[in-house]
């Protein structure tokens, strides 16, 4: 579905085989994340030996897609779990590590796969369960990027890079760490509703902490609220006197042609926010088309055990401020 969606022309790689040449869905997702990481490192003009550490995660138990996928690269590894907010978690920790001087280059990556997510959290694919209209479709995709201590120079890179454009580059200039927000939702098939309160909290705190209004951002982009979650987010922010409708977009709504592709409320999964960020958003920031963006990946915190025991589904959302910085090198000179 992703390769036929609205963003198909922006992806670096589209694989027609959902198994990625592997024998299991889990191995397929590991291979996909490894490919994304390899692409990101190569586009930065680096090798795995140049990467000080990697922050990566996924939706599977014990984050096996990430650990198995990154293992062959030989990079010091931190495994993360933030559900579908994992890309925001990895970018936050990567930015902190770089700014603290713990590494010149940090790799951030995540992935999701429709089949592995269904197997992990819902029903076997052969069961053919009917999905409610509030449900989202897990994106089969992966995204990775390299955070550097120094501005990337497009003059020195062997080819184009989403982080180094002739007009400038994308930089992380601030973060708002998400809180676990429990609104008492129990419907795991309405994850947009579960995550919207967390997105509201993070966006509201970001605007307060940085003394900004929604208009100070060219776009506020949430991870995977979908149509249902977007409406709930607007209502919750309206109660706080904030209207972001003119600048809001959602990665879950950008990933598919919802009606034509029958994805109901939209897309979801770790790979949803990650693939939209790396394929579509970062190049637009690097080129200067977008000057300042608040990127807010959202996650629904649950497991098979917590759901079966009747626990509510909490949400979390991490805010990442991404800004366009003019290129440090003009006219082909560093």
Language-model region placement:
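Short, well-ordered, mixed-charge alpha-helical segments that flank or form enzyme active sites
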Residues: 63-64, 114-119, 180-184, 229, ...
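Condensing-enzyme catalytic core mediating Claisen C-C bond formation in acyl metabolism
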Residues: 1-26, 124-205, 209, 242-264, ...
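Conserved active-site "lid/cap" helical segment
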Residues: 1-55, 59-65, 190, 198-215, ...
